[in-house]
């Protein structure tokens, strides 16, 4: 299941659009990463192309790594546990679904 995106702020700087928000994990994690689908928020950020950079961080000690996709709907977030092994495939553990502070920053090229 995709990570749910909640936008907190959008900053349209000179050449880029910076999007700040939170992610909510639910359902199951798949080996290789969970989908981060920006089409669900594209109208709010005026984006038609995938981000050029994404940062994700939480409060559980797990490590979140962005895997660039080719479109708005196929970005991925890979999760490694505190012991630096990938989170196992299956239901998300309570520490992640209960983390209400999984933050992200995404940078998009500004549409001209």
For every predicted segment, state its role.
Residues 1-37, 99-112:
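Extracellular receptor-binding modules and their adjoining Ser/Thr/Gly/Asp/Asn-rich linkers
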Residues 26-96:
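Extracellular attachment/recognition segments
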């Amino acid at each position: 299941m995709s990570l749910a995106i909640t936008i907190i702020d959008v900053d349209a700087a000179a050449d880029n659009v910076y999007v700040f928000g939170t992610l909510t994990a639910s359902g199951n994690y798949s080996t290789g990463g969970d989908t981060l689908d920006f089409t669900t928020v594209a109208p709010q950020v005026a984006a038609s192309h995938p981000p050029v950079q994404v940062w994700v961080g939480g409060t559980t000690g797990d490590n979140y790594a962005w895997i660039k996709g080719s479109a708005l709907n196929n970005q991925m977030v890979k999760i490694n546990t505190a012991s630096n092994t990938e989170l196992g495939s299956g239901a998300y553990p309570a520490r992640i679904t209960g983390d209400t502070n999984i933050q992200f920053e995404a940078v998009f090229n500004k549409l001209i």
